[in-house]
């Protein structure tokens, strides 16, 4: 049975939609130099799929957005154009992990949106970006397991917690590592559009639960993890490039999780391939693609792999091609309990 929204003590404050809007407007931020693949695409896919909110992808600059560790895309608009066309600002701003957590232009835009009344949501290490704006002062927050101790030392006015998948504190929400993007997006949807919208969307994705329960203490670096990571990185002669075919109307969530996981093995790179240079997803995400290369391995996504089954399926594929240690290394990076 699907989970309802978290208890009242863990709630997110969202004002009524601004400027006479009938539905909330959610802006998802991208920095062109580097934006985490799943952190960005999963909230986009889930919120768009619901049909209950308006979603816009906003990049700092014009042109290509490099996703990390794989894929490239085009945003819908830029900070400047968004400000010109939506002077009242967004109702909600989602901040993925960014290559630069301290870029002045990004921090200034986030502060501006917050000052205009936007609720701020950070996915994974997007929490560091929000912390750099000062918006996490006197808040309870979380982030990726690897980053939390460093964040505790740097941002002492924030209470950092390990045991919650996502944390809602007033008008700010933060999440743990990459794989938290699915439950956190459904929880956010429940606040924005009601529990029934979250349940219906989750049902379509095959997701059964999205509570904030989390055992953060199970994630950490061990000698075995270090050994497999170094071995994969240094054995360059074994590195591969995978072609990930995409077609018009592709499922964003499954493509994102597939590319993200394979891109974290430290043995493989992933590129989207298609006949067209720009391929639009089911819900309007514009992915940049290149022609397939016969020298590359082809990644296929089995029919029926979606939602909660997507990541376990990819991790099983990685274990089959490489080994279970590499699959576990990827799961650790994604803060996914394997």
Predicted feature residues:
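A conserved active-site-flanking secondary-structure segment within enzyme catalytic domains
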Residues: 137-162
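Extracellular/periplasmic ligand-binding modules, especially the Venus flytrap/periplasmic-binding
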Residues: 177-181
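Conserved Rossmann-fold dehydrogenase catalytic segment
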Residues: 161-173, 206-207
